[in-house]
């Protein structure tokens, strides 16, 4: 990939490094095969309680948009923990694929929908949504039908995937709140929604390989 294209893609898609100072250094860094090389992690630009979006706009760190892509980053980290406990190669491949897509999703949210951009920002695509749906269908077909709601737990891998699922649900709620105020990429919203479903299915899948799901028993402790 030419450096210019890779550099623009980086600037459009890295919410965790999108301070104005880092963007400035990335823009003026020399051409290389790795345009994301950063020689310094802290920038002091967030010391006033604000952070920069991918387009340079400044927002308070408690803003719902920052909370949304922060939750996506959190979910990605939880998936990383889940991967430490997953032995199935197919599940590992899916989770690693998702981790990369979550950077796309965070980058999408870090670049608000605007018109008349010089460079088209990186956006989550319908193809990525379809990929998630196909994996849901594939893994769900191998599972026994559900007889009750599932309690989060079972194997360590499943427990962490349930955790990631709930974090993604939180991110989706933040994204929906943003969408009531300003345009949000519809594919990004659908991706977040489908991803929580995929993580639920994968949690059940790894549980069936090691330990049965823990089912909810309504009113078990009422008497």
Spans of features found by a protein language model:
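Intrinsic disorder/low-complexity segments
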Residues: 1-33
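Phosphate/pyrophosphate-binding loop motifs in nucleotide- or prenyl diphosphate-using proteins
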Residues: 28-223
């Amino acid at each position: 990939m030419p450096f210019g294209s890779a550099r623009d893609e980086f600037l459009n898609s890295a919410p965790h490094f999108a301070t104005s100072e880092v963007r400035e250094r990335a823009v003026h860094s020399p051409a290389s095969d790795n345009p994301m090389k950063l020689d310094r992690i802290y920038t002091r630009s967030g010391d006033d309680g604000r952070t920069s979006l991918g387009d340079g706009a400044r927002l308070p760190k408690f803003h719902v948009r920052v909370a949304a892509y922060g939750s996506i980053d959190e979910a990605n980290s939880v998936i990383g923990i889940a991967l430490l406990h997953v032995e199935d190669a197919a599940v590992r491949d899916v989770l690693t694929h998702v981790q990369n897509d979550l950077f796309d999703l965070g980058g999408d949210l870090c670049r608000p929908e605007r018109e008349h951009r010089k460079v088209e920002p990186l956006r989550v695509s319908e193809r990525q949504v379809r990929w998630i749906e196909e994996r849901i269908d594939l893994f769900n077909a191998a599972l026994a039908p559900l007889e009750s709601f599932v309690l989060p737990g079972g194997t360590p891998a499943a427990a962490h995937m349930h955790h990631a699922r709930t974090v993604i649900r939180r991110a989706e709620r933040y994204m929906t709140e943003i969408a009531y105020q300003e345009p949000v990429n519809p594919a990004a919203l659908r991706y977040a929604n489908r991803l929580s479903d995929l993580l639920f299915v994968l949690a059940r899948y790894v549980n069936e390989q090691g330990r049965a799901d823990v089912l909810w028993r309504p009113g078990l402790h009422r008497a």
